[in-house]
Amino acid sequence: MSLFPSLPLLLLSVVATSYSETVTCEDSQKICPAVIACNSPGINGFPGKDGRDGTKGEKGEPGQGLRGLQGPPGKLGPPGNPGPSGSPGPKGQKGDPGESPDCDSSLAASERKALQTEMAHIKKWLTFSLGRQVGNKFFLTNGEMMTFDKVKALCAKFQASVATPRNAAENRAIQNLIKEEAFLGITDENTEGQFVDLIGNRLTYTNWNNGEPNNAGSDEDCVLLLKNGKWNDVPCSSSHLALCEFPI
């Protein structure tokens, strides 16, 4: 390998070294004005990494924020307990006398008479269709079959009592009214063999069938009016026609 090609490079190095030792910065600027001035600030580098969080600061003073808008009204709460009664108010002034129309006694009497007439017509209709009237008694049936206790309850509901004939005329009126055997208001529930009405009075009229009362079933404590008008003792638990009497 030849050494000659390297010789020019070696000479250039020596010249550059010697030149750099003698040329100052001011001279270099005169020689090469395009060269950047010596010791001039460089270009800013990239931002560094974030530092660590500092210590927690002291609590600041309360802020002065603006008051918000008023919210919608809430739901109604439960009603409270009633308050104590207030004291009576002052007494008012006496009012003027009222005006009362003159009572027309003749008008009242005519209306009363008309009402009585209408009630009499109603009684006649009932008598014709459903019942019989004898003296001051009105016998009525609803046509239903029931036990003696239910008959008593039914009659009491209408402020009446179970039909109890006190004479032959009343007995015959009931006989003509019924189409089925009906209970009478007579029993010997309290004392066997001693038949009385429902308020405990002894009977002053009877119309027993032949051989009756015989208490054949040992519990025949009620009385039945047969279709022939005669009486027979029967159990109160049996069901027969309901018949009531109304005082008029």
Swiss-Prot record:
Keywords: Calcium, Coiled coil, Collagen, Complement activation lectin pathway, Complement pathway, Disulfide bond, Hydroxylation, Immunity, Innate immunity, Lectin, Mannose-binding, Repeat, Secreted, Signal
Annotated CDD domains: CLECT_collectin_like
ATP-binding listed as a keyword: no
Domain called C-type lectin: residue spans: 134-245
Biased composition (Pro residues): 75-87
Residue ranges the record marks as coiled coil: 112-130
PTM (free text): Hydroxylation on proline residues within the sequence motif, GXPG, is most likely to be 4-hydroxy as this fits the requirement for 4-hydroxylation in vertebrates.
GO CC list: collagen trimer; extracellular space; multivesicular body
GO molecular function, one term: D-mannose binding
Chain segments carrying region Disordered: 43-111
Biased composition (Basic and acidic residues): 49-61
Domain called Collagen-like: residue spans: 42-99
Biological processes per GO annotation: complement activation, classical pathway; complement activation, lectin pathway
Keyword Secreted: yes
Localization (cell): Secreted
Disulphide linkage map: C155-C244, C222-C236
Database matches in InterPro entries: C-type_lectin-like, C-type_lectin-like/link_sf, C-type_lectin_CS, Ca-dependent_lectin, Collagen, Collectin_CTLD, CTDL_fold
Alphabetical list of Pfam families matching this protein: Collagen (PF01391), Lectin_C (PF00059)
Entry domain remark: The coiled-coil domain mediates trimerization.
Name assigned to this protein: Mannose-binding protein C
Organism of origin: Trachypithecus obscurus (Dusky leaf-monkey)
